[in-house]
C-alpha cells in the first residue's frame, strides 16, 4: 500500500529496475494496491520460496515466521437476472450494429459462463454435438479438465447469426477484452439496466453503492451464468461441473447466499 510513497522516496530504484524493461518512458508513479492484490502477491512469493527450498536452491525462508499475509476478502457477487439477460438480448440496437455484435457475444457468454480469456480462444471446433467444450486456461496447469456446457436455443441462434461473417476460425467476432468491457457498459446503459448494487472497493475495502452499468464487465457474464444456474438447481457439484469451480472453492462458496429467495427456502 505504501508503494506510491516509496516511489517518491526512492525513484532511482524504479529507474534501475523498471516494471517494463523494453521501454523508454519515464516510470509512472504506482497506484495504491488493494489488500487482495497484496495478499495474492505475498502468496506467490511464498510459493516461489517453497519451490526453491524443496529443490535445494536455498534454505532461506523469509515466510517461516511471517504471519501477515492474511486472506482475500470479496463482496457478495452481483449478477443480472434471466429477465435482464433477455431484455439485453431483445433490445433494439440496430442503430449501432457494432454494439449489437458485442451485445450478442455478452449474451452468449452469459449462457455458457466461461471466463473472457477462454471465450476469446474459442473457435468453431469448440462446438461439439450441441455443446461448447473447452479446458479453462486458468486451471489447466494444476487440474486440466474439459468443461462441456450444452447450448440452448438462443446460444445456437447467436452462433448461426455469425456463421458466415467471421474472420478465420473464431467462434464469434471478438474484439479486445478492454474494448469488450467498454461496450458492455454502453450496452447496459442503452438497455436501461442501471440499478444500484453493493460492491467492495478493491483498493480501500470499503462498501460502495454503484450503478451496475458503470461497473458491468465480461466477468459479470460469468457470475450471471453461475448465479442463475445455482438459483435453479441448488447443486454446487453440478454448477461446478459447468463453471469449472473445484469442490470447496472459496470463490464458488460466495455464490451460495446471493439470492434473496434462496435465503427464504
Label the model's feature ranges.
Residues 136-140, 177-180, 243-265:
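Catalytic-site neighborhood detector that most strongly recognizes the C-terminal catalytic loop/helix
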Residues 19-43, 54, 58-116, 120, ...:
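Basic, Lys/Arg- and aromatic-enriched nucleic-acid-binding interface segment
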Residues 1-22:
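A Lys/Arg-rich helix-loop hairpin that forms a DNA/phosphate-binding surface
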Residues 94-99, 165-170, 185-241, 245:
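Short, basic (Lys/Arg/His-rich) helix/loop patches that form interaction surfaces
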Residues 46-49, 53, 259-263:
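C-terminal flanking helix
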Residues 68, 112, 121-160:
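Conserved tyrosine-mediated DNA breakage-rejoining catalytic core shared by Y-recombinases
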Residues 88, 147-157, 161-162, 252-265:
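DNA/chromatin major-groove-contacting recognition/catalytic segments
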Residues 121-127, 230-232, 240-247, 254-258:
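A short, basic/aromatic helix-end/turn motif that makes direct DNA contacts
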Amino acid at each position: 500500500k505504501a508503494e506510491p510513497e516509496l516511489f517518491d522516496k526512492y525513484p532511482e530504484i524504479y529507474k534501475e529496475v523498471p516494471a517494463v524493461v523494453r521501454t523508454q518512458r519515464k516510470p509512472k508513479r504506482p497506484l495504491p494496491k488493494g489488500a487482495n492484490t497484496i495478499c495474492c502477491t505475498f502468496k506467490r512469493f511464498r510459493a516461489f520460496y517453497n519451490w526453491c527450498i524443496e529443490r535445494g536452491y536455498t534454505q532461506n525462508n523469509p515466510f517461516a515466521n511471517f504471519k501477515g499475509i492474511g486472506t482475500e476478502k470479496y463482496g457478495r457477487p452481483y449478477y443480472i437476472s434471466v429477465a435482464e439477460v433477455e431484455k439485453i438480448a431483445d433490445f433494439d440496437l440496430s442503430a449501432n450494429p457494432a454494439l449489437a455484435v458485442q451485445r450478442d457475444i455478452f449474451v452468449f457468454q452469459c449462457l455458457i459462463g466461461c471466463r473472457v480469456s477462454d471465450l476469446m480462444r474459442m473457435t468453431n471446433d469448440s462446438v461439439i454435438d450441441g455443446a461448447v467444450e473447452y479446458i479453462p486456461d486458468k486451471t489447466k496447469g494444476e487440474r486440466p479438465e474439459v468443461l462441456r456446457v450444452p447450448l440452448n436455443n438462443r446460444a445456437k441462434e447467436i452462433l448461426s447469426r455469425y456463421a458466415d461473417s467471421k474472420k478465420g476460425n473464431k467462434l464469434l467476432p471478438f474484439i479486445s477484452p478492454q474494448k469488450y468491457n467498454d461496450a458492455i457498459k454502453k450496452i447496459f446503459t442503452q438497455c436501461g439496466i442501471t440499478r444500484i448494487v453493493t460492491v467492495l472497493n478493491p483498493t480501500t475495502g470499503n462498501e460502495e453503492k454503484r450503478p451496475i452499468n458503470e461497473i458491468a464487465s465480461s466477468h459479470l457474464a460469468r457470475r450471471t451464468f453461475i448465479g442463475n444456474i445455482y438459483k435453479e438447481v441448488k447443486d454446487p457439484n453440478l454448477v461446478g461441473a459447468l463453471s469449472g469451480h473445484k469442490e470447496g472453492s472459496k470463490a464458488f462458496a460466495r455464490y451460495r447466499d446471493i439470492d434473496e429467495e434462496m435465503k427464504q427456502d
